[in-house]
C-alpha cells in the first residue's frame, strides 16, 4: 500500500483501480501492426543510384563494373522476441511495442535500406506469430512498379539461439534466412529442448510481477505474462519424424547445428545459416572456440556460408592471444595472472575478495581469494554473480579486449573470425583439410524492429542494446548470503542474471551489410549473398571493392575461392560514407505521419549530404590456415600484413602483390575511415583513461550518448587462395 501511495495513488482510488485491473488488465497478444508508408518512389531511388554510379565511375575509370552496392540488415528482432518485449517494458523507460510492420517503415524511411530480414528468436515465436510475420513479409515486399528501382526486399527467417554450459556443448547463435515465403518451413526451428523450460528467457518471468508496482501499465506486463505462458504451453514436436509430417502448431527444435541442417534439408528450401555474436561472452562459456564446430556436427559449408563479424554487440573479427582461463590436461581450469593488456575476471575476483577480508586471518583471506577465483572460473559468463552485491566498477576491465575496435563484451578470442579462418580439421587427412570459408557481413541485432540503425550516432538507449531500469525503484538487487564471501553462480541458461550493467559499455548502433548485386531484385540480392560477394561495415555506408586481378579465369571478387600457383595480385577500391545532414529528408517526412516518424526515427533519418568522409588507409590481413594438426595459431594471422595510406582522400585505389605466396592463404581488407564521434566509441577500459562505465540504466544519464572518437570501417569478404 505504501508503495502505491509513494507513486501518487491515494487510498480512495485504490479499490476502483484494482477493479479496473481485474476487468481490463488480463494479458493478450500484440498484433503484427500495419505498414504505414508506401513504397519509395522510382524517382528517389533512381537519384540515389545515380550518386552511387558517379562514385563508382571515379574509382573504375576505364574499367566498367556491372554490379551496384546495396545495403541491408540480416539480423532484426521485433516484439515477438521475448527479450525484445521485456527490454521495452515501462520500467525500462523506453517506448513499448515494436511490431513487425514498424520494421518495414523504419527500413524504408528512417534507414533507407535496400533489404533486410526478420530474425526473431525461434524459441519464442508462437505458431500465430510465425504466420503473421510471413504476411508482413509479403506486404512489405510490395514495391513500386519499376523492377529496376525496386525499393525494398524483405527475407523471412528466424534466429536459432543455443547456449551451452561448457565449450563442448555450446554451439552459439545462428540466423536462418530464406529467399521466399513459398516453401518456407511450417514452423521456425529453435534450440530449446524439453525439460529446459524457457531457457535463457526464464529470467524474464520476474518482470511480470512488476505490474503490481506499476498499476497504470498493468496491461503491458500482463501481455508479457501472456506471451510467456503461450510459448511455454506450445507442445514440443516429436523427435525422429520428418519435419514435413509434423503438426503445424507444435514447437520444433534442433539440439545441434547438424540437426538444424538436416531439418532444413527436409524442407528443401533455399536457405542461408549465419553464425553471429561469437566473441560476445555475455552467455558464452570460458574456453569456447570454433574448433568443436569444424566438423559435420557443427558446420555445413553449403548452408553456413556467411559470418557476422560486427553487430550491435560489437566486433567479432580480431584474434588476440589472451585467455580468461588456463585449461590443464586434467580438464580443470586455473586462473592466469594479468598482463599489461588483459585482466582475467578470475584474478579480479581475488582482488575484490581481498577488500572484503577485514577482520579475517591471513590464512582465511587467502583461502577465500582462491575460492573466489575458482568460483569465477566455474561461473563462466556469470562472473558478476560471484559477488552479487558488488558494484560493476569493482570488476574493472576484466575479460575485455582493451585494444580491439568496438569490442564485444567479455571477449572470447577463439571465437573470432580470424581464429575461424586459421584453423583446419585434418580428420580426413592432411591433404584434405576441412576449413571455414565464410563471407563476412555485419548487421545490427536490433531488438526494436529498427533495421540498419547505424546510419547516425544518436539516441543510445533507442538505437543500441543498452539495457537497464529507468529508476532505482525498478532496480532488482540480488542479495548475497554473505557479502564478504564468494558465491558459486548457477550456469544453466536462465538461472543467473547476466552482467547487464557492464555490458552496456559494449553496445553500439550496429553494423550494416553490403552486397555487390547485379540489380535490386530479390533474386539478384540473394545471388550476391550466395556467392559471398558481400562485405560489412561498422554502420556507415562505406563503398568497398576487393578483387584478385590475376586469377586463372580473370578478375575474382571478394568471397571467391581460387586455386593458383603464381603470386596473387589484388586491387582495392574504397570510398568514404556520405556525411549526414541533420533531420530527415522530405520523402520520409511526407511518407510517414509525424507521430510514426518520431516514434520510429526519433527525429533523425539517413539523410546524406554531397560530401564523403576520408578513407585514411587500407589494411590487408593475411591468414595462412593450419597446414598440419597442432600448428600454432598466432603466427598464422598477420594483422595487418600490409597498411597502405590513402593520402587524405575520400576515394582510394590501391594495388598490392604477395611475393611470398607459398601455401594456402586467405586475404581480406579493412577500409579505415577518418575519426568520427561514436556511441561507446572510445575504449573506456584503457588504463590511460579514467575508468568509467556507460550504463544502460538510470545510473548513467539516459540522455548521455557516451561519445568517443573512433575509426569506423568496412571489412571485405575474404578471398581464399589454395596453392596446388
Model-derived regions, located:
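N-terminal secretory signal peptides that target proteins for export/translocation
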Residues: 1-9
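Sec-dependent signal peptide recognition
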Residues: 9-16
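C-terminal motif of bacterial Sec signal peptides marking the signal peptidase cleavage site
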Residues: 23-25
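C-terminal functional module detector
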Residues: 27-91, 117-130, 134-135, 229-251, ...
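Active-site-adjacent structural elements in enzyme catalytic domains
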Residues: 64-71, 76-80, 86-169
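Short, intrinsically disordered, low-complexity segments enriched in Ser/Thr and Pro
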Residues: 101, 105-108, 112, 189, ...
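Extended substrate/RNA-proximal surfaces in nucleic-acid metabolism proteins
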Residues: 134-280, 305-308, 312
Amino acid at each position: 500500500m505504501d508503495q502505491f501511495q509513494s507513486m501518487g495513488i491515494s487510498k480512495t482510488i485504490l479499490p476502483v483501480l484494482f477493479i479496473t485491473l481485474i476487468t481490463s488488465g488480463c494479458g493478450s497478444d500484440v498484433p503484427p501492426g500495419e505498414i504505414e508508408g508506401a513504397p519509395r518512389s522510382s524517382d528517389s531511388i533512381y537519384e540515389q543510384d545515380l550518386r552511387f554510379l558517379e562514385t563508382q565511375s571515379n574509382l573504375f575509370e576505364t574499367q566498367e563494373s556491372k554490379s551496384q552496392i546495396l545495403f541491408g540488415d540480416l539480423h532484426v528482432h521485433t516484439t515477438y522476441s521475448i527479450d525484445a518485449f521485456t527490454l521495452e517494458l515501462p520500467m525500462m523507460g523506453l517506448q513499448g511495442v515494436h511490431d513487425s510492420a514498424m520494421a518495414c517503415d523504419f527500413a524504408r524511411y528512417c534507414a533507407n535500406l535496400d533489404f533486410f530480414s526478420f530474425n526473431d528468436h525461434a524459441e519464442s515465436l508462437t505458431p500465430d506469430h510465425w504466420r503473421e510475420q510471413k504476411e508482413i513479409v509479403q506486404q512489405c515486399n510490395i514495391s513500386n512498379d519499376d523492377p529496376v528501382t525496386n525499393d525494398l526486399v524483405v527475407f523471412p527467417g528466424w534466429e536459432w539461439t543455443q547456449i551451452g554450459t561448457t565449450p563442448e556443448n555450446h554451439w552459439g547463435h545462428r540466423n536462418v534466412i530464406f529467399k521466399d515465403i513459398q516453401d518456407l518451413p511450417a514452423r521456425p526451428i529453435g534450440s530449446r529442448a524439453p525439460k529446459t523450460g524457457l531457457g535463457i528467457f526464464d529470467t524474464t518471468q520476474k518482470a511480470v510481477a512488476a505490474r503490481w508496482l506499476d498499476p497504470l501499465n498493468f496491461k503491458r506486463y500482463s501481455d508479457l505474462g501472456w506471451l510467456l505462458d503461450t510459448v511455454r504451453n506450445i507442445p514440443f514436436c516429436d523427435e525422429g519424424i520428418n519435419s514435413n509430417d509434423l503438426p503445424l502448431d507444435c514447437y520444433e527444435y534442433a539440439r545441434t547445428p547438424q540437426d538444424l541442417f538436416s531439418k532444413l534439408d527436409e524442407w528443401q528450401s533455399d536457405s542461408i545459416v549465419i553464425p553471429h555474436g561469437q566473441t560476445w561472452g555475455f552467455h558464452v562459456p570460458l574456453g569456447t572456440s570454433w574448433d568443436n564446430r569444424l566438423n559435420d556436427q557443427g558446420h555445413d559449408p553449403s548452408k553456413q556460408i556467411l559470418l557476422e563479424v560486427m553487430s550491435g554487440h560489437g566486433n567479432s573479427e580480431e584474434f588476440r592471444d589472451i585467455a580468461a582461463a588456463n585449461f590443464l590436461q586434467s580438464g580443470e581450469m586455473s586462473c592466469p595472472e594479468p598482463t599489461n593488456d588483459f585482466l582475467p575476471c578470475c584474478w579480479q575476483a581475488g582482488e575484490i575478495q581481498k577488500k572484503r577480508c577485514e577482520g579475517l586471518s591471513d590464512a582465511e583471506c587467502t583461502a577465500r581469494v582462491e575460492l573466489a577465483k575458482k568460483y569465477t572460473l566455474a561461473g563462466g559468463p556469470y562472473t558478476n554473480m560471484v559477488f552479487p552485491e558488488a558494484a560493476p566498477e569493482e570488476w574493472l576491465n576484466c575479460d575485455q579486449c582493451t585494444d580491439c575496435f568496438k569490442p564485444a563484451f567479455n571477449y572470447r578470442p577463439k571465437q573470432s573470425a580470424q581464429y575461424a579462418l586459421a584453423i583446419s580439421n585434418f580428420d580426413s587427412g592432411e591433404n584434405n583439410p576441412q576449413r571455414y570459408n565464410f563471407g563476412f557481413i555485419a548487421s545490427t541485432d536490433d531488438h526494436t524492429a529498427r533495421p540498419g540503425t547505424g546510419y547516425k550516432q544518436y539516441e543510445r538507449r533507442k538505437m543500441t542494446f543498452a539495457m537497464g531500469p529507468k529508476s532505482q525503484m525498478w532496480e532488482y538487487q540480488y542479495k548475497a548470503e554473505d557479502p564478504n564471501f564468494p558465491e558459486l553462480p548457477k550456469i544453466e541458461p536462465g538461472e543467473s542474471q547476466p552482467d547487464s550493467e557492464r555490458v552496456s559499455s559494449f553496445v553500439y548502433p550496429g553494423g550494416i551489410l553490403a552486397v555487390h548485386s547485379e540489380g535490386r531484385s530479390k533474386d539478384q540480392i540473394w545471388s550476391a549473398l550466395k556467392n559471398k560477394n558481400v562485405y560489412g561495415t561498422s554502420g556507415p555506408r562505406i563503398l568497398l571493392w576487393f578483387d584478385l586481378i590475376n586469377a586463372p579465369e580473370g578478375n575474382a571478387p571478394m568471397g571467391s575461392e581460387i586455386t593458383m600457383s603464381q603470386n596473387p595480385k589484388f586491387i582495392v577500391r574504397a570510398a568514404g560514407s556520405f556525411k549526414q545532414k541533420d533531420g530527415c529528408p522530405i520523402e520520409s517526412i511526407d511518407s510517414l505521419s509525424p507521430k510514426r516518424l518520431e516514434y520510429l526515427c526519433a527525429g533523425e533519418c539517413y539523410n546524406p549530404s554531397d560530401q564523403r568522409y576520408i578513407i585514411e588507409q587500407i589494411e590487408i590481413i593475411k591468414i595462412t590456415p593450419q597446414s598440419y594438426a597442432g600448428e600454432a595459431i598466432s603466427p598464422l594471422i598477420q594483422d595487418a600484413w600490409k597498411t597502405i595510406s590513402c593520402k587524405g582522400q575520400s576515394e582510394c585505389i590501391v594495388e598490392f602483390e604477395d611475393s611470398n605466396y607459398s601455401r594456402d592463404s586467405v586475404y581480406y581488407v579493412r577500409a579505415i575511415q577518418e575519426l568520427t564521434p561514436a556511441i561507446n566509441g572510445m575504449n573506456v577500459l584503457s588504463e590511460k583513461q579514467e575508468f568509467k562505465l556507460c550504463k544502460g540504466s538510470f545510473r548513467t544519464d539516459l540522455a548521455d550518448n557516451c561519445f568517443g572518437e573512433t575509426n569506423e570501417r568496412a571489412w571485405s569478404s575474404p578471398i581464399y587462395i589454395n596453392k596446388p
